[in-house]
């Protein structure tokens, strides 16, 4: 396979959030869909032997948080995906800042009950400085949550970035009915996938089928959805790929990482909206990825995973995709 084709199928993104927003749980659900793991370990309940795959240090297993950046790779629908799972806790932010230098885009995870939090703001500013496209996943809709319009307003006012909801929640917590896909014009009805399982038995209803939709979610939720759709279509920003790529507009998705609801839809929309790695700039101009010289940026050195050091690097140039220097 040629170097050019290898580049085109790659997607490298970081996941950023405030602690406990669900970042590591979302990462594991991505790995489930890529077939990299068969059972997701929730970051809750660390007294058991089941831990999150991206949390490999003993302190991470004990505390249920990420304290170092993990680099995870899997294949999905023809894409080779690299996830940079970054620490959310402020004490370990230096590792996060360095890792963001290697990301082509970022997924910002927000707790629906808490909104934009302190560490999210700090990490967001780093992404803005680097002009990284940012995609927002508003998590934990299966719990009590803030009003979705208020969440959008908070993202825009606090972070200073325009929002474009790609899907829209119907209820929350015990009354969470599902999400409306604004692009596909259908409703995915909520049903949780528990115990780390991959499959979600999702029923999808055409949004124009009023009788069926009312039967599934009830008259009150149906009427509220129609009001929300009308307001969104009239007031929210339209999707603009150039603005997304420039980091001026963030597509917003709602779901629940813990119950695996909305994760696959988010992943597929995300892959369709992102681009393959672009040539990097240096103080001597744009770096040609097809040059014969080898160059890379080492953004992490891990000495604790096993006896041998493992370096994580962003490859700038290489004569061959199978170059032994990079193996």
What are these regions (language model features)?
Residues 324-327:
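N-terminal low-complexity segments that are often proline-rich with Ser/Thr-Pro
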């Amino acid at each position: 396979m040629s170097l050019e084709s290898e580049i085109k199928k790659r997607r490298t993104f970081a996941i950023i959030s405030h602690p406990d927003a669900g970042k590591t749980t979302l990462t594991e659900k991505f790995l489930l869909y890529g077939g990299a793991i068969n059972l997701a370990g929730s970051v809750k309940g660390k007294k058991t032997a089941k831990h999150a795959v991206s949390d490999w240090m003993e302190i991470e297993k004990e505390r249920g948080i990420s304290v170092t950046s993990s680099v995870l790779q899997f294949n999905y629908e023809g894409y080779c995906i690299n996830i940079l799972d970054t620490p959310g806790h402020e004490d370990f932010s230096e590792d996060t800042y360095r890792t963001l230098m290697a990301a082509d885009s970022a997924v910002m995870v927000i707790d629906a009950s808490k909104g934009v939090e302190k560490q999210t703001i700090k990490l967001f500013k780093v992404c803005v400085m680097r002009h990284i496209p940012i995609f927002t996943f508003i998590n934990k809709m299966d719990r009590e949550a803030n009003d979705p319009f208020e969440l959008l307003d908070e993202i825009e006012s606090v972070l200073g970035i325009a929002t474009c909801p790609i899907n829209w929640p119907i209820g929350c917590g015990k009354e969470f009915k599902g999400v409306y896909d604004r692009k596909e014009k259908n409703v995915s009805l909520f049903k949780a996938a528990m115990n780390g399982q991959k499959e979600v038995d999702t029923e999808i209803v055409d949004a124009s089928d009023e009788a069926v939709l009312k039967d599934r979610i009830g008259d009150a939720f149906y009427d509220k959805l129609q009001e929300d759709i009308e307001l969104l279509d009239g007031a929210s920003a339209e999707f603009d790929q150039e603005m997304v790529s420039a980091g001026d507009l963030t597509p917003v998705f709602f779901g629940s990482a813990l119950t695996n609801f909305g994760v696959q839809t988010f992943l597929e929309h995300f892959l369709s909206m992102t681009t393959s790695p672009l040539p990097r700039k240096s103080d001597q101009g744009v770096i040609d990825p097809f040059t014969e010289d080898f160059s890379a940026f080492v953004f992490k050195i891990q000495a604790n995973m096993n006896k041998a050091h493992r370096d994580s690097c962003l490859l700038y140039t290489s004569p061959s995709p199978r170059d032994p220097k990079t193996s």
